[in-house]
Amino acid sequence: MSLFDHSVSELHKKLNNKEISVTDLVEESYKRIADVEDNVKAFLTLDEENARAKAKELDAKIGAEDNGLLFGMPIGVKDNIVTNGLRTTCASKMLANFDPIYDATVVQKLKAADTITIGKLNMDEFAMGSSNENSGFYATKNPWNLDYVPGGSSGGSAAAVAAGEVLFSLGSDTGGSIRQPAAYCGVVGLKPTYGRVSRYGLVAFASSLDQIGPITRTVEDNAYLLQAISGIDRMDATSANVEVGNYLAGLTGDVKGLRIAVPKEYLGEGVGEEARESVLAALKVLEGMGATWEEVSLPHSKYALATYYLLSSSEASANLSRFDGVRYGVRSDNVNNLLDLYKNTRSEGFGDEVKRRIMLGTFALSSGYYDAYYKKAQQVRTLIKNDFENVFANYDVIIGPTTPTPAFKVGEKVDDPMTMYANDILTIPVNLAGVPAISVPCGFGANNMPLGLQIIGKHFDEATIYRVAHAFEQATDYHTKKASL
């Protein structure tokens, strides 16, 4: 039995009782990585020397009264979250040897909580992708079946947790990039409310959509991690001055009287029968615990995919303009003048998907098309946000599938961008509205790959979605299933 089969609270107790050491936890992580990483390929960079040194330092503090629940816990960090002195590449050749000189706010907070960073996790390049096949280095595989993708863009973050390489991880979610891989890998992934967690130190893809969040084995562990990284940050003007509260207090298993909305659009065209049936089965579980549910409509969700790709690509074209070969990152050797420097550096440094989205965004922002595309997409985004607000006026949470289907095979969709983009059709509206959502395991498809249940909450009401997710988790055993890698 792996130490990582235990929850954070169980491991904390074992540490305080001196049944295990922090060094034991760190060595457990690196041993598992040595055993499976050649197949899973979840990590881009390991930090073994510093992690082992930190473990020895913390071992001397075991049993101290001020040790928090995350004391000594091994964590993996998505490679678009900067880490001081530890290579951060965004899985792009553009940043292949970039060593940041500061920590992201979330990393600072986790260091203050005495977690130990095991390494940096693979992803789709600059967080653009749904399968991890867009990594500029190598593709991560799904621990449940290595022939299948782990999802993206936080595929390495989800796969590392599912494979037992780390206890938990950080990912980022712009259009589903935490929830979709969490669903595909059978783990728990939360996208917080926009502004709940500081984005300082997150390499920007689409600044109005990006949000950092936790990926864990259980809902309780997820709540611990979000508790640690949440809160206003003077380094991020978009972080919200809203009380964080105690997420753990609501994990009682009680959902009696809870009002659940189920959008008909989330169970209709384009959603596979397996995903639909798993959600209906989950609703029966919650209904049996005293919750009620009704079908509702989110009428503008059908426009979400087009809206998202116009807005996110537009923001990406602006955000990625900083990678020009002048200040940091790769610089082309094939240069005769300044224009060559810009053009060749970006052509050689960026992968195909990143270039595709930069081109789309530049087009949408161009003077002749701004009103027809970018401005119109912003107007539709407001309508989508209003849809959620209208539903939440009468309901506590919204529930549906996280993804239309279970994970697909490696290479199956990589040459068809539109089919690939459609994998995020159920997660994208949440980012456009800025509300929080969690994915928890809720079954398996015919290919024995995991399915995820998406629970969506009101702005800054992560506590309620944790309450529902935890109640469902405790009433089922899906979270106890492990990939037999």
From Swiss-Prot:
> Which enzyme class?
ligase
Keyword line: ATP-binding, Ligase, Nucleotide-binding, Protein biosynthesis
Q: Which residues cross the membrane?
A: none
What does this chain do?
Answer: Allows the formation of correctly charged Gln-tRNA(Gln) through the transamidation of misacylated Glu-tRNA(Gln) in organisms which lack glutaminyl-tRNA synthetase. The reaction takes place in the presence of glutamine and ATP through an activated gamma-phospho-Glu-tRNA(Gln).
Summarize the subunit comment: Heterotrimer of A, B and C subunits.
Q: Which HAMAP family match?
A: GatA
Protein name from the UniProt record: Glutamyl-tRNA(Gln) amidotransferase subunit A
